[in-house]
Amino acid sequence: MAIQGIEGVLQQMQATMQVARNNAVETPPSVSFAGELQAALGRISDTQNAARTQAEKFAIGTPGVALNDVMVDLQKSSISLQMGIQVRNKLVAAYQDIMNMQV
């Protein structure tokens, strides 16, 4: 008799837990502008470091490192840096526009 009583309580608890799971609202992960900007800067830095490492490997004569691969990596690095600079310029211009607005 006592076991049946416990089983009933367990079933009620499991049903309550299932209802709570179904009613739980999953919040999407919050994405902040600062976080995205920092991640983009990190990717630019990683690209530059990879290109620099590739160039150093080519300079010391590591087998399997071709000049065309080095040049492509250096161009990717340069383009990503230029893109980062342009984004910064647009952000500064937008900030200046907002600061020049009259209230």
UniProtKB/Swiss-Prot annotation:
Its main location: other. The keyword Nucleotide-binding does not apply. One of its GO terms (cellular component) is bacterial-type flagellum basal body. It holds the Pfam family FliE. One of its GO terms (biological process) is bacterial-type flagellum-dependent cell motility. Keywords: Bacterial flagellum. It comes from the Bacteria. Belongs to the FliE family. This is Flagellar hook-basal body complex protein FliE. It comes from Cronobacter sakazakii (strain ATCC BAA-894) (Enterobacter sakazakii). The lineage of its organism: Bacteria, Pseudomonadati, Pseudomonadota, Gammaproteobacteria, Enterobacterales.
